[in-house]
Amino acid sequence: MATGKCYCPEDPRVGPLLVLCLLLLLILFSRSWNVAPVVVPSYHTVYHHEKYQNIEIQK
């Protein structure tokens, strides 16, 4: 019975704590690479595509 009472309060906190730790790790890694895994590559591809279209129009 005692072990059950000890585990009950901890259970709800473990999930959110793990999620927060994973998010912090992701942020640290993205900063160390100077690249946000999803946002930056998609932004660059769109930017280069627009540049390429503008160059074709100017020619």
Curated annotation (Swiss-Prot):
Keywords: Membrane, Transmembrane, Transmembrane helix, Transport, Viral movement protein. The chain crosses the membrane at residues 13-35. It is a single-pass membrane protein. GO terms for biological process: transport of virus in host, cell to cell. The keyword rRNA-binding does not apply. It is found in: Membrane. One of its GO terms (cellular component) is membrane. Cell-to-cell movement. This is Putative movement protein p6.6. It comes from Panicum mosaic virus (strain United States/Kansas 109S).
